[in-house]
Amino acid sequence: MNQPCNSMEPRVMDDDMLKLAVGDQGPQEEAGQLAKQEGILFKDVLSLQLDFRNILRIDNLWQFENLRKLQLDNNIIEKIEGLENLAHLVWLDLSFNNIETIEGLDTLVNLEDLSLFNNRISKIDSLDALV
């Protein structure tokens, strides 16, 4: 089985990674080309897919204030952090990571679907605010 993550260095989410992901996942036809030329505003992005990127830390997502779906599965994330500004998030996938504590989710009051399977969870914290 091909597993490209093992050969890559651990990565932190930076502007370049996010711009590349947004560009790759945006519309590919003429409208998409226009958006790439003019620059896509992160606040306009509703869905972001960052799976299989060897991400070690969640970071630089504060600009995605209207994000509704975030896919961070199959990385090497150890801690749930950097999500406090994503109040509109409805769907979050953090499965297949190295997370030990469920934390940092208390501001995600619209969260409906949270996937955390296949992690190293031993402690659950700060879920009281969530319905």
Q: What feature does the model see in each segment?
A:
Residues 58-61, 80-83, 102-105, 124-130:
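Canonical leucine-rich repeat
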